[in-house]
Amino acid sequence: MDPKAIKEELRLFQSTLLQDGLKELLNENKFVDCTLKIGDRCFPCHRLIMAACSPYFRELFFSEDGKEKDIGKEVVLDDVDPNIMDMILQYLYSAEIDLVDDNVQEIFAVANRFQIPSVFTVCVNYLQQKLSMANCLAVFRLGLVLSVPRLAIAARDFIADRFETVSSEEEFLQLAPHELLALIGGDMLNVEKEEVVFESVMKWVRNDKANRVKSLAEAFDCIRFRLLPEKYFREKVETDDIIKGDPELLKKLQLVKDAFKGKLPEKKPKEKKEGEVNGEEEGEEMLPGFLNDNRRLGMYGRDLIVMINDTAAVAYDVVENECFLAAMAEQVPKNHVSLCTKKNQLFIVGGLFVDEESKESPLQCYFYQLDSFSSDWRALPPMPSPRCLFNLGESENLLFAIAGKDLQTNESLDSVMCFDTERMKWSETKKLPLHIHGHSVVSHNNLVYCIGGKTDDNKALSKMFVYNHKQSEWRELASMKTPRAMFGAVVHKGKIIVTGGVNEDGLTALSETYDFDTNKWDTFTEFPQERSSVNLVSSGGNLFSIGGFAIVELEDKNIGPSEITDIWQYEEDKKTWSGMLREMRYASGSSCVGMRLNAARMPKL
């Protein structure tokens, strides 16, 4: 056996034996020489244990020369919750403590007050692991109050990642000036526009104008005015009544206006301090913070095509021809359906997965959301009606899984499952007028459109239905010119574009476009090859086609379906499809969506 392992095993055995023995002595009230009195409750303990675990109690019980102080057996502790101290004492003797969200901050404060580092560290670790939108500001403030840099920095970074959302919370308006400045000053703020920072500061000031106006000059140094559009600066910043009333702020604004014209204040050499020699601390003074034009972390966002398969989610930048790893995806089943919402949230649902350990419900329809901050998939409640060949739509905070094939009966469905992203619950909503599978779904202005598909008798449809969730109503609209199933569909520049697919005549390359205002379908530029299962994506104002299946000559010289992994772009001025990449290996077996992601946060492939 490895000597280090033997040593660790012996240490663990001895510490366990010692701890069990000490707990037994406490339970049997043996060698007890101290009582902590809190209100009307008393807690027996051992001075030696308290002194060993806490510098506070060591100083209380012993003098600097190591002699025991004669302070009596009873130690009175004021302003302490006896239940909290009881939990801490039990931890010191057993290494067990039941931390929950409701008690951790109070335990943390008591451990800090009485200098009990073991409990303190356990609480810090718990709070770091449990950081959430609900507690991040409280944890940040706690870390500052108790002077715990590790916790304050972890909470600050969490808030910086989600600044736009956190800054809209009521608790944000309660921050002290030094707390606000600690959040908004850094490069790591995840905001796409500096307007968000300016508006959050002014909202914070107005929440307590009488007391906070005096802090605005300091907050100004954290706002990067040169990153604001000049039009916004003129219309929103210069006209603000609070700013106009402060001569000091107006001087700073004049420097910003000069900077917009290309005139920056001269950088003066740093003054030498007494004792410095040439070469030490040389350089120029930095520009004031309000003239800082370094981009924040969130300003590196790009419109990307995200390809998700059962191996990874890869984001492709068409303009730069670069790929980034958005997340590994081993837990994502094949043949899932993906959707990127208006709020830029990526969800994937379904895929064929058989849980052999579950006898009651072996077929599972898993459900994940991409956490772009941690580059990981967050598991959500599985869809209760396992199905394949369905599709997804959205309306406000609701997702809709529409029709498809039942995984157990293999029959087409008309049911529509609805997931509330705020309540985190699935429910069933108004059924589709038809039983179909292999259809496409798009969303526009909080309405959900179900297009084409196949019935159980293998007949391709040209019908289109629109769903209004507020009215719980499906309504039939104009039909496509060509019946089709397993085709690409996307909303691009305010119109629906469909291309490819399969019908009774085989694969098709025909494309169509739908005008929402006139309720009419028109012919769109035909795709260069007959294909099914095409991924149509609208990204950065451009239309792309990724992959699909075509009938080609196979390696054995027979003719059959084969997956294609190329990328095409539609050139609007020429009204033609232009080939961009002959092969994109990450597109194999992938669903594809257009999504805005931060390239600075993802490893480049």
From Swiss-Prot:
Record-annotated BTB domain positions? 32-102
**UniProt record, GO biological process:** proteasome-mediated ubiquitin-dependent protein catabolic process; regulation of sarcomere organization; sarcomere organization; skeletal muscle fiber development; swimming behavior
GO cellular component terms, alphabetically, are:
Cul3-RING ubiquitin ligase complex; cytoplasm; cytoskeleton; M band; sarcoplasmic reticulum membrane
Q: Where in the cell is it found?
A: Cytoplasm; Cytoplasm, Cytoskeleton; Sarcoplasmic reticulum membrane; Endoplasmic reticulum membrane
Could you list this entry's UniProt keywords, alphabetically sorted. Answer: Cytoplasm, Cytoskeleton, Endoplasmic reticulum, Kelch repeat, Membrane, Repeat, Sarcoplasmic reticulum
Question: In the record, what terms sit under GO molecular function?
Answer: ubiquitin-like ligase-substrate adaptor activity
Cite the BACK domain residue spans from the record.
Answer: 136-238
Q: List the Pfam families.
A: BACK, BTB, Kelch_KLHDC2_KLHL20_DRC7
Superkingdom: Eukaryota
Q: Where are the Kelch repeats?
A: 345-397, 398-446, 447-494, 496-541, 543-598
> What InterPro entries does the annotation carry?
BACK, BTB-kelch_protein, BTB/POZ_dom, Kelch-typ_b-propeller, Kelch_1, KLHL41_KL41B_BTB_POZ_dom, SKP1/BTB/POZ_sf
Phenotype caused by lack of the gene: Knockdown of klhl41b result in reduced disorganized muscle without any other significant abnormalities. Knockdown of both genes (klhl41a and klhl41b) is lethal by 3 dpf. Double knockdown fish exhibit severely disorganized muscle compared to controls and either of the single knockdowns.
Kindly give the PANTHER family that the UniProt entry links to this protein: KELCH PROTEIN, KELCH-LIKE PROTEIN 41
Q: What function is annotated for this protein?
A: Involved in skeletal muscle development and maintenance.
Protein name from the UniProt record: Kelch-like protein 41b
Q: Which organism is it from?
A: Danio rerio
